[in-house]
Amino acid sequence: MPEDQAHAAMEEASPYSLLDICLSFLTTNLEKFCSARQDGTLCLQEPGVFPQEVADRLLQTIAFHGLLNDGTVGIFRGNQMRLKRACIRKAKISAVAFRKAFCHHKLVELDATGVNADITITDIISGLGSNKWIQQNLQCLVLNSLTLSLEDPYERCFSRLSGLRALSITNVLFYNEDLAEVASLPRLESLDISNTSITDITALLACKDRLKSLTMHHLKCLKMTTTQILDVVRELKHLNHLDISDDKQFTSDIALRLLEQKDILPNLVSLDVSGRKHVTDKAVEAFIQQRPSMQFVGLLATDAGYSEFLMGKGHLKVSGEANETQIAEALRRYSERAFFVREALFHLFSLTHVMEKTKPDILKLVVTGMRNHPMNLPVQLAASACVFNLTKQDLALGMPVRLLADVTHLLLKAMEHFPNHQQLQKNCLLSLCSDRILQDVPFNRFEAAKLVMQWLCNHEDQNMQRMAVAIISILAAKLSTEQTAQLGAELFIVRQLLQIVKQKTNQNSVDTTLKFTLSALWNLTDESPTTCRHFIENQGLELFMRVLESFPTESSIQQKVLGLLNNIAEVQELHSELMWKDFIDHISSLLHSVEVEVSYFAAGIIAHLISRGEQAWTLSRSQRNSLLDDLHSAILKWPTPECEMVAYRSFNPFFPLLGCFTTPGVQLWAVWAMQHVCSKNPSRYCSMLIEEGGLQHLYNIKEHEQTDPYVQQIAVAILDSLEKHIVRHGRPPPCKKQPQARLN
């Protein structure tokens, strides 16, 4: 791996620096660290002065998060922040706010790419020009994708910045007269006028003795002949870099004619002719051999770049499509150009089909392209396809979590921006359906679950349906109780999942789609009374009875169904819905299942229903007494499971059962369940039980004179485990509950 690629991969695998963490936290919590002035702008409460490098990074971080506006730029007023290199990309600020926040600093660089239309290039330069120090010392100015002037499109303003060395003014209505003014700047060395309204570049002759870098990508309005253009270029003898690339829209022979010139651009080290017609390997090689100092040639979207000389493996870097090295160089250099990003990704996709090694450096380049062009469908489509190929199966295991987090965020954004594009949605779901991503990578799982559910409700593709419910089942288990309740409260979600269960039951089909759908419903109803009510109101109970009857030998199906019905039984308000003789009869028969997982959940349903007393039991009293005896005897026959067969968000649903001294079978089920999870996963459940006040409940059982001996024995065993846990780890402090996935 080349040194720069290795560095990129190492950077992603490393933890964020302390400075990055602090700045990100400050950025997302500005209201906690700032107070508001009378005009509504923010100022930091602490009086200290930030070092210049930190101030620059803070500004960049706020801009990156899309939080730079008239209010937040107030932080940079005064002298508390000392800016030198200011990045305000895509800021939403007014001309007045810009002047107050930035024009008193000693700026040497300003990147104002894509700021909102309320501020023009004239506003920015007028503000900068009000500071004499900036007039003489501002060296680099980036004004891409802005409006020149709202009042007077012919207003000239660049001459104020006499110290300017580098100017980028792409995607702007920038005319010949503006070029003439810029070319007269006494120190100008680098100029990017890509995709402007220039029709004639003759004005560049005014800076022919200074200009070292000239970028003229996609000059669509140029009216000069090829000979006239070359006559100007020939005079620019000090050029080190020349870019005349295009988006494959024109048939001009300018590139080939330039390559054939022997007496032109003697100091050139970098030439970009990507997207140009008539470019051949022979012509490119001859041009480079006449200029042995050449370090880069751009050949993407041309017919060249396929010879051994141009493979890009030596000191000469080549952007192209012939191999991975060329494609990576293209993605690196053209990250701001949507057409070239799409071209490079298209060719990368064909390579990644057979990729066997993890390529974090390549994935990072794909991420950059996705981030820079969020609303460009062709880019997002190609990028999402590449992401899947780069992260599928075991390849994801070698990817840094930090990089996968960025990828996942961008995939979700793509799904949000293009909800009706089926192939894009499919690409994103394919990538998201990864254990590595769903289990290990930090991202907004709540928003992801909502997006996937919306897709599921709008599409009927069977293969994609399986993936969607798999994703939802895992995400739902990772959400907090509050988030699960909020997600399940959306009636359409429960209805859609039940529809899938009904469809599979009618087809008598036990497949992964059915299993994942049942898991999703199980997780969504966990400690969520609203979701449980939606389940009942949508005839979920009747449907799940059919499932139990349709698949009597499928223990994994029975376990999931009974697990969800446990959640329903926990909700006291829904108790009467379960007082249904056929339902109770079927559950009681499953209590005697040879599969401990099935018997366990059947017992849980019965325990919850019996725990509410004789008055709440509206069926036969003799049946209740019989069930109590069966419950007690069944639990005593259970073998110790080899692994953790269930997971719980909290022990709160168990505590009411622990007080049922007149129904020992109910208590026995509760303590057996608690001992099971505490013995299989003590670090999680012992702490949880102590935090939630379980010790007192267990002591009550231990000391109560009516306690069943089997219940008492298990309670004492749990207390011993808890005491050992406290000795080993100390008494755990109160903490937020962490959601836990069920074992599917």
From Swiss-Prot:
LRR repeat start-end pairs: 185-208, 216-236, 237-261
An individual GO BP term: positive regulation of proteasomal ubiquitin-dependent protein catabolic process
Keyword Cell cycle among UniProt keywords: no
GO-annotated cellular components: Cul2-RING ubiquitin ligase complex
The UniProt record lists the keyword Repeat: yes
Record keywords: Leucine-rich repeat, Repeat, Ubl conjugation pathway
Any matching Pfam family: ZER1-like_2nd
Entry similarity comment: Belongs to the zyg-11 family.
Name listed for the protein in its UniProt record: Protein zyg-11 homolog B
Gene name of the encoded protein: Zyg11b
